[in-house]
Amino acid sequence: CEIGRSAVKGRAVLYPQPFGKVTAGADKDYPVDFSHFNIQGTCVGAVGVEADSDKAIFPAVDIATEVGAKDKIKMRVPFFTGALGSTEIARLHWEGIAVGAGISGTLVVVGENVCGMDPQAEFKNGRVVNSPELKRRVEIFKQWQEDAGEIVVQYNVEDGRLGVPQYAVEKLGVKMIEAKWGQGAKDIGGEVKLPSLERAKQLKERGYIVLPDPDSPVNQDAFRAGAFTEFERHSRLGMVDEEKFVQQFVREVAGLRSLGAKHISLKTGAYRPADLARAVRCASEARIDLLTVDGAGGGTGMSPWRMMNEWGIPTVYLECLLHNYLSRLAKKGAFI
């Protein structure tokens, strides 16, 4: 059916449908994935609770943890949310996820392009000075945050150019900033579909790559005539210099700290093994607080089907590589 529809509809079936209303991930089977792992318990002793038959019930177990290099962030649960960026489905469901993270005492991550995609955002000299959408997201979490957890604001190439980290730290009081290499689980696929010419032109003015070019009279006429019905906004891929990647990242982290960011995170996608090694080394030498390694299979779940299915290293295999790299660094006495 998918092949048949593609033959008839072409680009219309590149993405999971209906676009913006559903999330989807890769449906490709691998020899090993997380569904093959089961939790192994024991009747001898206990971890996280006293080994007492009258006390060892699962609601009583302490599963709290912490993240951070120097100043630790307390977390009442050992997991946190994925990054929820500028997609419509992320915007619609932000409140429930942010409230849940605040109550649970964990991290919630604002993904890329939120300010750039905010229709009501205000810019001065190419820098964001007001973003009601980012402000809304931060305030919702802070209303429900107690003594644990934190809100993280992620930035990519466009966000950096628009001054999103500065705005988040200085104007909204955000304490944790996440640098992003590429497009997370999709590596290079940072697309959003745009249904109107006005929206396409607005985002091009804000510095995004928009295809087809909405300023071209030929494309404008073709769009109005119905030759195509949507534009695509693309995010740029963050390029890392092969020889100077560590120095580049250390400088970037120092710049974020000088802004007042208390905690720094790096998010890298499911690139080839050498790139994961670069990310691990950068994280170690810059002594950041958190490294997020995003496996293949889909991010928010609105990427092209082929990107989610055919690109990157599956998560289990990627985590095995990560464990290997960290173990090797630990043996050398490096910062982990």
What are the functions of these language-model segments?
Residues 79-92, 154-160, 183, 236-245, ...:
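Active-site mouth loops of central-metabolism enzymes
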Residues 90-91, 118-138, 159-166, 187-195, ...:
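Active-site-adjacent beta->alpha loops and helix N-cap segments on the catalytic face
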Residues 174-182, 186-188, 192-271:
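Metal-dependent enolase-superfamily TIM-barrel catalytic cores that perform enediolate-based chemistry
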Residues 142-170, 317, 324, 333-334:
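Phosphate/diphosphate-binding loops
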Residues 75-78, 92, 97, 106-107, ...:
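Flavin-dependent oxidoreductase catalytic cores
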Residues 77-82, 106-112, 149-155, 175-181, ...:
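Hydrophobic faces of well-ordered beta-strands that scaffold small-molecule active sites
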Residues 1-76, 89-95, 99-102, 107, ...:
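Conserved, well-structured core domains of diverse proteins
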Residues 228-336:
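Glycine-rich phosphate/ribose-binding loops and adjacent secondary-structure elements
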